[in-house]
Amino acid sequence: MRIFPVFLLTFSLFLIKEEIVTAEVKVSAPVVNQSGIKLNLERQFTGSDVAINRIHFSPDGQFLLTAAADGVGTLWTKEGEMLGQLQGQKPPMFNARLSPDRQILITTGYDGTIRLWNLQGELLEEQQPHRAAVADAIFSPDSQIIVTCSDDGQTKIFTRQGQEIASVLKSGTARNLAYHPQGLLIASVSDSGSLHLINPNGKIEREISTGQGRINNVNFSPNGEQLLTSGINGSAKLWNLAGELIHEYKVVPTGWVNSAQFYPKGEWLATASDDGTIRFWQKDGQLIYELPLVNARLTSLSFSPDGKQLAATSSQGQVWVFNLSY
């Protein structure tokens, strides 16, 4: 793996203060509410001039991290105040994440690179694990292992210091990753609709054909016993670790489901789709909440770790932060 020296690339970008730009989109009332769920808009702002591909709450729930199509990662307060930007990655940036120990930020590049940053915005190092675009990068629960996946079909596992542990080659573009909450497995999904469960040593433990076409994201349930996938066929699917389908959620008749997330307390799940709508579902498939949000694609969702807030993003660069109660 090519690792670039830190001293050649270190620069500080944080402690930037900017006026909040409020998006001029009015949030309508939910058209379905069978559960008593309440989403009250806390903050709405413009996070980018282009599509925001992913948003994540920090592990402590105090910050938001966005990855945008222009190759810029941005750290925000929950109130929409920009703390700083991570620039220089070749666009588009498909994902950016914070390590569970809240010490490191990781961003992905279209040129096969990932960059590791500290919270002061200083670039610690740049690594090139792939020769094609890096679609996702994720930390293990103890923050010591990094996993990447790429357009080259490879999922790579290596130490925080850059030493490769394993490389798993599969057909099709590897699209998104999830780490088991106890670190037991890595889930890797692809444009071909396959879901692979890989152990930390790189052995494929199970391959699941989802029938969803390109899979946009994958998540483990909070207890680690189930998996959730979202696809371009308009569905989200719930699986057990044996690869058995528990339920299919037919979210939209046309268009993509771009994000499907477990509620942190495990009672239900949420989807965001091309029709600009947030939906909550019981695990048995009952639609319990539906909120039309915007006349644009919703690209990503993220629950705060305590489940009290939900963040959403759009293809127009908008960010919403809701307070959630039920």
Curated annotation (Swiss-Prot):
Protein name: WD repeat-containing protein slr1409
A Gene Ontology term for the protein's cellular component: outer membrane-bounded periplasmic space
A Pfam family hit: WD40
Keywords: Repeat, WD repeat
Domain of life where this protein originates: Bacteria
Taxonomic source organism: Synechocystis sp. (strain ATCC 27184 / PCC 6803 / Kazusa)
Keyword hit for Glycoprotein: no
SUPFAM superfamilies: WD40 repeat-like
Segments annotated as WD repeats: 47-77, 88-118, 129-159, 169-199, 210-240, 252-282
